[in-house]
């Protein structure tokens, strides 16, 4: 009997709508995963249905086009339904908030908690989205914090269980490198 393939979805929907920040992180993550994924594993790039070209291609990578836009007020209804259809084992949400009701494990990345420190700088839509952080932290099976400070904030301010939070610093894009001295 063949071993079961581990199906990991990476939520890349935001990359269609915004450049920089979390989109840059997500694309770097996908490039890195494309280099290490192997037999018995499949990375499913969860893209916006509007994003017709694959964000990244490679062996053991596939694309799933989703209808639910990121940060949409019905995201917590539509996205879980779409993910159920994809039969994922794990979904990684680089943009903080996973589907709270789902049939797979979830890993979230928390880049910082500036939205808690400076809520007056957020739009009404952003306030609604980031107000889900407490539920997201409780719901996630694992949490990636990009720094020790973010990990500390998650534990102290949001009540994350310390054993669920792993620090994995963000890496600079390979575009950035030391220059030769002249």
Task: Map each language-model feature to its residues.
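Carbohydrate transferase catalytic cores enriched for Leloir-type hexosyltransferases
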Residues: 1-182
């Amino acid at each position: 009997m063949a071993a079961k393939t581990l199906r990991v979805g990476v939520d890349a929907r935001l990359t269609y709508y915004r450049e920089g920040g979390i989109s840059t992180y997500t694309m770097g993550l996908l490039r890195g995963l494309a280099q290490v994924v192997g037999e018995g594993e499949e990375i499913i790039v969860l893209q916006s249905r509007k994003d017709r070209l694959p964000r990244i291609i490679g062996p053991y990578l596939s694309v799933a086009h989703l209808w639910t836009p990121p940060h949409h007020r019905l995201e917590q209804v539509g996205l879980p339904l779409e993910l159920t259809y994809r039969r994922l084992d794990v979904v990684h949400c680089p943009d903080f908030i996973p589907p709270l009701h789902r049939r797979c494990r979830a890993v979230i990345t928390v880049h910082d908690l500036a939205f808690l420190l400076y809520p007056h700088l957020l739009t009404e839509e952003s306030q609604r989205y980031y107000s889900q952080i407490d539920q997201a932290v409780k719901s996630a099976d694992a949490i990636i914090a990009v720094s020790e400070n973010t990990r500390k904030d998650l534990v102290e301010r949001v009540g994350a269980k310390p054993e669920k939070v792993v620090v994995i610093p963000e890496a600079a894009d390979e575009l950035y490198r030391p220059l030769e001295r002249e």
